[in-house]
Amino acid sequence: MRAPGFWWSVPTALPARLLAPLGRLYGGQVARRMARPGASAPLPVICVGNVTLGGAGKTPTALALAGLLREIGHEPAFLSRGYGGRLPGPVRVDPAQHGAAEVGDEPLLLARAAPTIVARDRPAGAALCAAADATAIIMDDGLQNPSLRKDWSIAVFDAGVGIGNGLAFPAGPLRAPLAAQWPHIDAVLIIGEGPAGEPVAADAVRRGLPVIRAQLRPEPGAAAALAGRPVLAFAGIGRPDKFFESLRAAGAEIRATRAFPDHHAYRAADLAGLERLARREGLTLVTTEKDRVRLPAAAPVTVLPVSLHFSEPDAALLRARLAALGPAPPDPRTRPD
């Protein structure tokens, strides 16, 4: 779905006021669900979630945390519901066999970095993570899902939009009232620059929660290859404009853009239309990694990969917090006979 513009406006906007009663009902139901006790997992569970619907940068955050876990000796596995995929799981994602229609787009990206389990039944998925010889689980999304007990939850916020109008769906972007979600959050991560993230940061500090800041940066080689090139940029993610901004920052000359709904299942007609326009205008088709896995392998599309970067003090804080969840077990290959 595409987020309606009034979500990012004031809460007194007419559509928001009309939908506010439904938002109170929906948000209250989610809040009550979040309060249920969850099953214990065989491994420490780190939840990367957000308080709003749509993209905030959870997948790059999960990948960055996996790197930090490896630095302190852990072997992470990712656990995902597999949004947009038809397989209920639990199943280990194999990019050579699975497509986005089966397991969703994010799991295909995560599986490049570590064992990735798709499971609508999160406790069953956690058991399969343990069977994959992981020592820690990174749950991509799931802050509002109570089925699995989390050891540490980090809420990701986009500094450009924050919590929007502060109302619960469908009146606004919140999955539940923010006051009901704070007790389930152990740290706040604000990605990018913008004033909308500052009220969230101030609220977190008042609650004694650490506030970590990070930036999404394009892969240098890919950015250099696009510098000065005329492009047709397209994306079906939570905030396509963020991707277009990244392309401009990389020096690409954006001649046209096309925004699709988040997790859009591209049809042959979509791609054919994009290719026609690109050929006619002499443009390079460019999209995100997440969109690329939803396209045919032979599609003539260039990708601009991005990754999340922390300052060293924030990276050190994260390493310390992750280490506090428990030491990684010794590698059996290093044990003396």
Swiss-Prot record:
Pathway listed: Glycolipid biosynthesis; lipid IV(A) biosynthesis; lipid IV(A) from (3R)-3-hydroxytetradecanoyl-[acyl-carrier-protein] and UDP-N-acetyl-alpha-D-glucosamine: step 6/6
Catalytic activity: a lipid A disaccharide + ATP = a lipid IVA + ADP + H(+)
Coiled coil: none
Assigned EC number: 2.7.1.130
Domain of life: Bacteria
Keyword Transcription regulation: no
GO annotation terms (biological process): lipid A biosynthetic process; lipopolysaccharide core region biosynthetic process
Keyword annotations from UniProtKB, A to Z: ATP-binding, Kinase, Lipid A biosynthesis, Lipid biosynthesis, Lipid metabolism, Nucleotide-binding, Transferase
Sites where the protein binds ATP: T52, L53, G54, G55, A56, G57, K58, T59
InterPro entries listed in its UniProt record: LpxK (IPR003758), P-loop_NTPase (IPR027417)
NCBIfam families per record: lpxK
Family membership: Belongs to the LpxK family.
Protein name from the UniProt record: Tetraacyldisaccharide 4'-kinase
